[in-house]
Amino acid sequence: MSGSVAVTRAIAVPGLLLLLIIATALSLLIGAKSLPASVVLEAFSGTCQSADCTIVLDARLPRTLAGLLAGGALGLAGALMQTLTRNPLADPGLLGVNAGASFAIVLGAALFGYSSAQEQLAMAFAGALVASLIVAFTGSQGGGQLSPVRLTLAGVALAAVLEGLTSGIALLNPDVYDQLRFWQAGSLDIRNLHTLKVVLIPVLIAGATALLLSRALNSLSLGSDTATALGSRVARTQLIGLLAITVLCGSATAIVGPIAFIGLMMPHMARWLVGADHRWSLPVTLLATPALLLFADIIGRVIVPGELRVSVVSAFIGAPVLIFLVRRKTRGGA
């Protein structure tokens, strides 16, 4: 390990943790109406009854927590996908998991009138799981291992089909379209803490699982044959990773809708900062992705008081950064 990488690693984690704290604080302070820090602190004291305190507790706190949960989930899911598929352009939408969750939620609303948070979460998990199983079955090869190329192709094909069906159902059913149009655009506008409580435990378990897979992912990134020679159980690692992706993507999609680009970009930035070792890149991704998502949400609230969707802002932020990272990597000969 070079000295520059060691120094970067020593700075990256505490620096990103501080950045995440700043993003969280600004998310509570800044919006269509900026509030002083004293009002935010008073709101958390439990004694404030003013309208400003209501804004903090009922509007900004839920969306801030949603950004933290969804950002962490999407970042880890993207990092897992890029390693499992050995495809640097993989993201949470590539394997069709987000599309499966979205399709299930829209289908449940159209056929059964599901509208509560619990019902939508259940449909999201079911859709994500079914999509993952279909892709895993289609992308499997001899010995029960997953072929990265077949896995990627199966995911792209399934995502295209499900996204088309989702749009068709929503457009043909005006009630469903009105109910889910903001969610389909990708937004942190969450007003119910109960929804976040329901997905908190699954996200924490899946996130911890992803972090515990760090060593196995390091071996797998060298190739299946090399990983097997090093004593890694490739099929088990791929299966556990796929299940973690299912839970992370299903939870994030159920909370904030389909948000692209975040899971694609941030793992690249993490590897650029601290190297390809998953023991470092996964924690850095876990800290950096929620921070970026919160900053994107803040920018959307400031630019357009009527709420420019975070998915739009994240795409504008993410595209130039990713292009820079790709060009830098190309010049370095990697």
UniProtKB/Swiss-Prot annotation:
Compartments in which it is found: Cell inner membrane
GO biological process, one term: siderophore-dependent iron import into cell
InterPro entries, per database record: ABC_BtuC-like (IPR037294), ABC_transptr_permease_BtuC (IPR000522)
GO cellular component terms given for this protein: ATP-binding cassette (ABC) transporter complex, substrate-binding subunit-containing; membrane; plasma membrane
GO function term, MF aspect, one: ferric-enterobactin transmembrane transporter activity
Induction and repression of expression: Controlled in part by the amount of available iron. Induced by hydroxyurea.
Alphabetical keyword list: Cell inner membrane, Cell membrane, Ion transport, Iron, Iron transport, Membrane, Transmembrane, Transmembrane helix, Transport
Topology in membrane: Multi-pass membrane protein
Similarity section: Belongs to the binding-protein-dependent transport system permease family. FecCD subfamily.
Chain's role: Part of the ABC transporter complex FepBDGC involved in ferric enterobactin uptake. Responsible for the translocation of the substrate across the membrane.
Record's protein name: Ferric enterobactin transport system permease protein FepD
Organism of origin: Escherichia coli (strain K12)
Taxonomic lineage of the native organism: Bacteria, Pseudomonadati, Pseudomonadota, Gammaproteobacteria, Enterobacterales
